[in-house]
Each structure stands twice: as C-alpha cells, then as structure tokens.
Amino acid sequence: MDTERHATLLLDLVWPEVDEKAQGFIYAKDFPLVVSRMEEILNRGKLERDRAQLVSETGREILRKFGSDQEFFKVYKEDFRELFDGLVGTSFKSAVKSCAGDGVLDRLQDSQAVDGIQDEKTSSHALQEEVMRLREQVRVLSSKNDEKDREITARDEIIADLQGKDASPAGSPRSLQRMRTLQARVTSLEDELSFRDEVIREKDRELLNLTKRVGEFKDKYQFLEREFQFYKGHREQKSPDSIKEATRHEFIISELRRKITEQSEIIGQMRMQVEAKPGALHPQGIGSTAGLPLNLPLRLVLRLIIGAILAYLAFDIGIRSLKAVGGLFGSSSPATLTPKSELSWWEQNTLLSKLLWFFKDLFDTYNLDAGRDEVVSANYDKLFGV
C-alpha cells in the first residue's frame, strides 16, 4: 500500500469517530482530538519507547492554540490535509509516512477485513432465525390489519357522506394546487439552504487565508524582534557613527548567514530525495540511454540553481563586508576641494571608491545615493520583507 492510500485509510478510520452526526465537517476544537486518535491507531501494539508521534510538540501546541482561538471554525474533510499542512508546516502524507513505516495500517486493514468476514458468518444464522420470527409476526399482524382495514373503510364511507359540499376530495384541484405550492416552497427553502452553506464554506476559506497571512506577519515580527535583540546586545554609548554602521552591517551579515544555512539544509534535503531513489528516475524496463534525457537536465538545473543562489549570496556578503570594513578603516587623508564630512565613507577610501565606481560604470545600476543611510535602510527593508 502506498503512502497516499495510507493517509486516506487513516483519515477514513478516524473521521467517523469524531464526526458522529455525519455532517461532513468538524469544529476546530476537535482538530487535536483527530490527531490524537490517529496516533492511537498508529501506535497500537507498540512499546512506550517505540511510539511514534504524528506531529511534534510544537505542532501539537499550535493545534491546541488553533482549537481554542477558532473554536467553532468548520473543518471539512476535504480541507483537512490543506489545513494540517498550513498549521504544522508538514504535509499530512509525509507525517503519516514517517509513522506508518512498519506496516501497521496494512495489518489494521487486513484485520478489519477478516473480522468483517467472521462477523458475517456468525451473524448469518442468527439473522435467519430473526427473519423467521418476524415473518410469523407479520402473518399475525396482517390478519389483524385486514379486520382494521374493513372497519376503516366503513368509517371513511360514513365520513364522506357526512362531508359538506365545500369539502375538497383528495384529488380536487384545490388539493393539487396546495400540494404544488408546498412543493415549490420546499424547493425554495432547499435552494436557500444550499446557498447559505456555500456562503459559509467560502467564508471559512477566507478565514483560512487570513490565518496564513497572520502567520506571515508573525514571521516578520519575529525577524524584527531578532533585529532589536541584536542591536540591544551591541549598543554602545557615545560610539562613532562608523562603529554603529558596522554593527548594522554585522547584523545584515548574520541574517544572510542564517538564510544561507537554511537554504543549504533545504538544498541538502532536495539532493537526498533526488539521490535516494534512483529507480524513480530510471524505471525498470527502460535502458540507460532512454533514462539519460530525463536524468541529466534535472541534475543540471539543480546545480545551476544552487550555483546561482550561492554566487549571489557570496557576492552580496562580500560587498557588504567591504562596506563595513571601509567604514571602520577608511582613509583619513585631508580633504581637498570637498570637505570630508560631506563625503560618503566609501568615497573617503581610495580603493573602495575605485571599485564601486568601476561597477557603477559597468552595470549602471547604482545611483549617487547608494551609500547613504536612507537608501541603505530602504534596500535593507526590501531585502528582508519588512
């Protein structure tokens, strides 16, 4: 059984236990309960040390907070996987794959099939006896009903004779018109109910999108908080402007290193996934000549992407490091025509000035205010999405 069927089987087993009324949805307060039931199924027959967790402790805390904050948010069965991915940060399929590697779901499905066959065999004899008993009761009741039917028929004839001229028979035009009116009313109410359900579903999806946006703003807030803590730890009273600027560039370099580390981990995981299963790129029955056009472009594209990212980050870190070093050890030669206080720090250093003006003339992408604090702050905010 592949991973997709594992995930579908696990969701189909747990969902009816929580959605007891078969409404097709559960409330967000029951979302952690679904995950805990899934973990109980996956850990049946396992020792305490071998028990697997579908989500981490951090993910479990996120689910509890989501269930308490959005208590009556409707979670539909078809939206469960997308919501699980958005909250935990891991796809539901991958989470099930990491916990069901020992074939526990295969054994569970086989045992359910065997139990169903045995229950069917043991209950067939009892059902036959129950059917025979019910048939005998039906015969007795039928004989009694015949007598009741004759009495009811006689009473109906008497009532029909006593009814006035204004009475409407069952098949009269007035009765038919009333029936059609009621049917139209029922149809209208059903359409209105379907429309309201669709509106509620759409609002639920909008709320899900807003939840994702809140997560993005939370990431930006955490970045600003790290920046504040960094500056708070490196503050120095009455320090020169060059040292303050160097501290700012030092934080930029530390953030770039952190991003390089994260991207290196992602690239390493992608490389492991590509190299772990060579059979996916070279299917059996196909020669090496036929597999070459599919294998070579994929590796080439991955290498080009990795090289471009590393080259860009190395160039950016180098430029910012040169700026920081120039701010600390810039030339202090006396000013000639322009006062030193009016020159930028990179204009005061001969080597950096030549290098930066050379790249400006070559690419024509720098402006005259590239080294000023306002432009640096704007570029810095744009880089980190603040």
Swiss-Prot record:
Broad class of where this protein is predominantly found: nucleus
Protein topology in the membrane: Single-pass membrane protein
Short name of one Pfam family: MPS2
GO cellular component, one term: spindle pole body
GO biological process: protein localization to spindle pole body; spindle pole body duplication
Keywords tagged on the record: Coiled coil, Cytoplasm, Cytoskeleton, Membrane, Nucleus, Transmembrane, Transmembrane helix
TM stretches of this protein: 296-315
Coiled coil ranges: 117-232
Record keyword Lyase present: no
Localization per record: Nucleus membrane; Cytoplasm, Cytoskeleton, Microtubule organizing center, Spindle pole body
Superkingdom field: Eukaryota
Key word Cytoplasm present: yes
Family listed: Belongs to the MPS2 family.
Described purpose of this protein according to its UniProt entry: Component of the spindle pole body (SPB) required for insertion of the nascent SPB into the nuclear envelope and for the proper execution of spindle pole body (SPB) duplication.
Protein name: Monopolar spindle protein 2
